[in-house]
Amino acid sequence: MSDIEKGKKIFVQKCAQCHTVDKGGKHKTGPNLHGLFGRKTGQAAGFSYTDANKNKGITWGEDTLMEYLENPKKYIPGTKMIFAGVKKKGERADLIDYLKKATNE
């Protein structure tokens, strides 16, 4: 069972320096993640993506995020995201549950 509060802590520690989740939130080094679930890679309006992100052509959901967040550069070679990933599956599940809630409010 995942834990949204743990997921929020992981987001604050590992993601928030580059991403926002609020509706209408600004892009930082990385795109605003509001509306992430069900969106195709490289599609946040107003953010400049690499061709690798635009051309990946997957839709973000629990399964794709689980794989991507383990090793972003392996999942999308050429991504600008300079993040090593979250290696522990339980932590990724917590983070994804937090993102599911936070990017949809």
UniProtKB/Swiss-Prot annotation:
The keyword Secreted does not apply. SUPFAM superfamilies: Cytochrome c (SSF46626). It is found in: Mitochondrion intermembrane space. InterPro entries: Cyt_c-like_dom, Cyt_c-like_dom_sf, Cyt_c_1A/1B. The modification Phosphotyrosine is found at Y49, Y98. Binds 1 heme c group covalently per subunit. Phosphorylation at Tyr-49 and Tyr-98 both reduce by half the turnover in the reaction with cytochrome c oxidase, down-regulating mitochondrial respiration. Its main location: mitochondrion. Heme c binds at C15, C18, H19, M81. The keyword RNA-binding does not apply. Transmembrane segments: none annotated. Disulfide bonds: none annotated. GO terms for biological process: apoptotic process. The modification N6-succinyllysine is found at K56, K73. The modification N6-acetyllysine is found at K73, K100. GO terms for cellular component: mitochondrial intermembrane space. Keywords: Acetylation, Apoptosis, Electron transport, Heme, Iron, Metal-binding, Mitochondrion, Phosphoprotein, Respiratory chain, Transport. One of its GO terms (molecular function) is heme binding. Electron carrier protein. The oxidized form of the cytochrome c heme group can accept an electron from the heme group of the cytochrome c1 subunit of cytochrome reductase. Cytochrome c then transfers this electron to the cytochrome oxidase complex, the final protein carrier in the mitochondrial electron-transport chain. Plays a role in apoptosis. Suppression of the anti-apoptotic members or activation of the pro-apoptotic members of the Bcl-2 family leads to altered mitochondrial membrane permeability resulting in release of cytochrome c into the cytosol. Binding of cytochrome c to Apaf-1 triggers the activation of caspase-9, which then accelerates apoptosis by activating other caspases. Belongs to the cytochrome c family. PANTHER family: CYTOCHROME C. This is Cytochrome c. It comes from Otolemur garnettii. The gene is CYCS.
